[in-house]
Amino acid sequence: VAYEFKAIDHIQLAAPKGSEQEARKFYSEILGFSEVDKPPVLKKRGGAWFQSGSIQLHIGVEEPFVPAKKAHPAFEVGKLEELKEHLKRRGIEVIEDDNLPGANRFFVSDPFGNRLEFLEWMK
């Protein structure tokens, strides 16, 4: 093969029209992602872009909107238990799961119903 896959450039999740402020509250204020500017040509589409380290997450407007309840991104996290407690203190429902050998993990839903996984590999 003459080509190679190098990395995932970004993750895109959908949200309903007009939900940008709610996305900012969840992804920036609660999870700690920084909002990054969308290119001017894409701003009129709505949504918002966020970044944490090398992870870029795009929230795109989709009408009609249907949340991703099964398909999901999985974020590898340091200090997973601290994140879990942080989310619980903010009223976010944490769904425990121990079915991945070698890792601790849990799931949450964003304000729009999209499933998110957070995991930490055990050493």
Label every model-predicted segment:
Residues 1-24, 71-73:
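N-terminal beta-strand motif that seeds the catalytic metal site of vicinal oxygen chelate
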Residues 69-87:
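Mid-chain, well-packed structural core segment of small domains
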Residues 58-60, 116-117:
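Conserved beta-strand in the GNAT
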Residues 13-56:
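Core segments of cupin and vicinal oxygen chelate
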Residues 42-46, 67-69, 100-104:
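Short acidic/glycine-enriched loop/turn segments that link adjacent beta-strands
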Residues 1-6, 90-123:
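Vicinal oxygen chelate
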